[in-house]
Regions:
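Regulatory modules associated with amino-acid/nitrogen control
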Residues: 1-170
Length: 170
């Protein structure tokens, strides 16, 4: 049943372990506002965060904003919209001195911030204003961000490519 509810490209992009995790998260979701799962991948030196919640709750925006507020580097993201109204957002976050393998406190703090966001106790702007900004070396050439949307008649999928200078939160 789970696979029938997912988009066509789901099995091409999600591993069997991820599919099993998504099924477990959805089963435990029930009457909660969201479910957040954290896992550290030692072989790639990154953290994987998976958020499961109802569509329309601005899940991607809230998760990315919360991670950005902690000045963590997002390496990749996957978003899956189920036909039954559930969204699954997975982010790969670089392990660093701010978020090493043993530091579970930062992930508890992120979960608490998400709880406050989903319950409406705080807004994302307030969380982002509290973040520490790190000044880097000035770039010599400005780069104009571009978004390319590619949709071809023979391909049922839309490819969105973003070109921009990389920085925390991008």
């Amino acid at each position: 049943e789970h696979l029938r509810q997912m988009p066509e490209d789901y099995l091409m992009t999600a591993s069997s372990e991820e599919v099993a995790l998504h099924i477990r998260l959805i089963r435990s979701f029930k009457d909660k506002l969201f479910i957040l799962h954290h896992q550290f991948h030692e072989e790639g030196n990154y953290h994987n965060l998976t958020l499961c919640c109802p569509i329309g709750s601005e899940a991607f925006k809230k998760l990315v904003g919360t991670i950005t507020a902690k000045s963590l580097n997002i390496l990749g993201a996957q978003i899956y919209l189920k036909k039954d109204g559930i969204i699954i957002v997975s982010l790969q976050v670089e392990a660093s001195t701010k978020a090493d393998a043993e530091d579970l406190e930062i992930w508890k703090d992120i979960k608490n911030s998400l709880s406050q966001l989903f319950e409406g106790e705080i807004n994302l702007q307030k969380i982002l204003k509290s973040r520490i900004r790190y000044a880097g070396a000035q770039k010599k050439m400005a780069m104009v961000p571009r978004v390319h949307v590619e949709r071809t008649a023979g391909n049922p999928f839309t490819v969105i490519r973003v070109e921009a200078r990389d920085h925390i939160g991008m």
